[in-house]
Amino acid sequence: MSPQTETKASVGFKAGVKDYKLTYYTPDYETKDTDILAAFRVTPQPGVPPEEAGAAVAAESSTGTWTTVWTDGLTSLDRYKGRCYHTETVVGEENQYIAYVAYPLDLFEEGSVTNMFTSIVGNVFGFKALRALRLEDLRIPTSYSKTFQGPPHGIQVERDKLNKYGRPLLGCTIKPKLGLSAKNYGRAVYECLRGGLDFTKDDENVNSQPFMRWRDRFLFCAEAIYKAQAETGEIKGHYLNATAGTCEEMIKRAVFARELGVPIVMHDYLTGGFTANTSLAHYCRDNGLLLHIHRAMHAVIDRQKNHGMHFRVLAKALRMSGGDHIHAGTVVGKLEGEREMTLGFVDLLRDDFIEKDRSRGIFFTQDWVSMPGVIPVASGGIHVWHMPALTEIFGDDSVLQFGGGTLGHPWGNAPGAVANRVALEACVQARNEGRDLAREGNEIIREASKWSPELASACEVWKEIKF
């Protein structure tokens, strides 16, 4: 009997390089309910057709490599490969296309945002056939989203914990963000909470530096919270930043926060990483802590319009990984188009079911089923004159965060907090009475300032400030 010289896998195998579109461009493919769908903005190199560029993205982010390999015969590529099933031209842009790619669910580990991103965007962005590449949106199928815990608690549970309903929540980032001692930091926290804010916040880069170690900060902030709660009769919180150099240290800080009895901790989810974030979210659910998420580093990824990843993808990923709040920009003063895009991903954070709407940047219908929602946080350069617009745009399920708009009050931190609380209560009351906040906003603030010297002073200071 002659020895076997040819394996079954090698039958029909032909070495060499072949066009990606022969295997990975499948315009007749009908997407499945279980597929993860991606919309990529593709800018091909000169001479590369959009179908080949889209197929290259599908290949390199799933089963493909640069050459044909004989081990392809050991598996079913048709079952596991990503498929570029449609391309379309981006209106008004030269040589830009949207390539739609479908990925079989079996390519992804359950409950791992880390693995999902490693597959879809991990290796393909440096591809030579592409001049630029941007991931615009993802459709997460129910069969995959159900493998994630999602936010530790969600919007309704947070309201029940805080016993606060029918209005946006108010926050303030303590400034200067770096340099204060723990005791002075705690003093600022107390003054803001005592004045009427619901939350104060560590800034994203407040971790455990020589001038203020984390344990000292946690202790003085907890003292401030309890003192303010006793004086106001309201539940208060401070976002204690648990972000650290290792997951073990991060969890240690969260454990200490829980032992102090505070309601909420914080994490920088992009610099900390999705694995760390998901670990912290699981700990927070198990131990009754709310989790505030800061998006530090997001602009490195999402600022370029033709390369990187849109923030709506990072927002969806955060909802899966876990967080009860996330920063979402302010909208105020931006162009109308930017407003619609921002409200698009705000809905993706809060709502259970979001219809496809290209005018708002939503490429796919998204059904989150029962996954809890995330509260968007409006923060950055806002003050009392913006309160009517913010209340109208973001609605009740939001946190409006005034850093300089609180601490910059000429009379001090507590009067700054009073001014913001009075402005918010006036806007909510006016809205509930049927008044138009967009049209009558300035008048509503002026009327309220007659009864609040703190608000009147704030109105005077910031009357000339515009975006």
Swiss-Prot record:
Modification after translation is described as:
The disulfide bond which can form in the large chain dimeric partners within the hexadecamer appears to be associated with oxidative stress and protein turnover.
Residues recorded as bearing N6,N6,N6-trimethyllysine in the entry: K14
Where in or outside the cell it occurs: the entry states:
Plastid, Chloroplast
Enumerate the propeptide ranges: 1-2
Domain of life where this protein originates: Eukaryota
Q: Where is the active site?
A: K175, H294
Instruction: Write down what this protein is called.
Output: Ribulose bisphosphate carboxylase large chain
Source taxonomy: Eukaryota, Viridiplantae, Streptophyta, Embryophyta, Tracheophyta
